Amino acid sequence: FGSCRWAAPAVGESDPVGPDVLDTLSARLAADPEAERPDVLLLLGDQVYADETSADTRAWIARHRQAAGTGSDAPPDQVADYEEYTHLYDESWGDPELRWLLSTVPSCMVFDDHDVVDDWNTSAAWVADMRATPWWHERITGGLMSYWVYQHLGNLSPAELAEDELYAAVLAADDATEVLRAFAERADADPASVRWSYRRDFGRTRLLMVDTRAARVLEEQHRTMLDAQEAAWLRTQVIGELGDVDHLLIGTSLPWLLPPMVHFAESWNAALCRGERGPRWARFGEWLRRRADLEHWAAFTSSFERLTETIAEVGGSDAAPATVCVLSGDVHHAYVAEPVWTTGQPPRSRVFQFTCSPLHNSVPAAMRVGFRFGWSRVAKGIGHLLAHHGRIERPAIRWERSGGPWFGNQLMTLTLRGRTARLRLEKASADAKRGRRETDRAGARLVGILDRNLTKGG
């Protein structure tokens, strides 16, 4: 699992962000057909970048708009509508290694912001600003239409597809464009009308992929990551219908546990935005929120607390799974964090935050320093000062990283057998010789960074 993948360049072109880890995974699997393969590949957001396009795509967009007479109001370096999204998906998933991988290994996906636009649904003020632009309606409509076609359909089981009214309508139509358009417009206008989250059971392992973008409630005094229906659905899957499960996996594009300083900074910012320190601080808070991407679980305080309570409840039950693992991406580095409950009965399950990103992208050097600093004792002290200024209560847990941060194009693998669990982290390395077995077309291969037992006997 992992997230954040720019399209790989064409053969022979230089790659400014290094080798694509999915291409290298594909090359390793293809080199030994008898070797063990992943049971499932989880892509945790930013599968495409609608707002950060390649030079080739920008040139195609210009030609297309001139010929079709469309997109005149849209940014020239971003996709504008469904037709342009189809080109973006073709570019992103068209390289031979990735096409083979997606045709060979089952996959589950969920969107994040760049699948539509950076900071998608970060706040009510942001939504109002975007809806005032002349190009936003076509962007969000095309983004949701294409997401349903290229990503979400593959998340549905055969039984779910057989009962899906939209799928039936699309199959029955000669041209399903207007059917899909009406669906996407309704999904944008009324997010509660559609559920993008879903559940998959792999034997005694349950996977819940949670939509943390479209299901938000953005009114400042009642901000939640998940609306009431979505939150109730998640709780039902975790508590009400869990049954005999050895491992519970919660896939959320945005990490639950961040570096502590970042967590408190986001909680402080949310307090400012809802007026805890007055209107002037609220205006500053909104300005800062958009520029610093302060929109993870920590920025939705009640949702963070509810998810934490739900994990503690399932982990403390008589039928507690061996592990509860939150799988995330987004932040362009990888780490392992483990919480400790400071109040109440701690869960019997081992609880982990596994964050792995990017698959094929980069992070500036200054941000690498910041991510490392965010876990330090000094940074925690700064975070506590911000929390005090924002009049924020301490959470019911504290947490430390037990691995990382790691940087580069990387992929985490969970191996679950019975009630045992093992975690592996691998990075795409360009140091291999071209043509060597298990190398991709750029001559890169996977290099092991971490291999750790998570449970006794793992």
Model-predicted segments: where are they?
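Metal-dependent phosphoester/phosphodiester hydrolase catalytic core
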Residues: 1-458
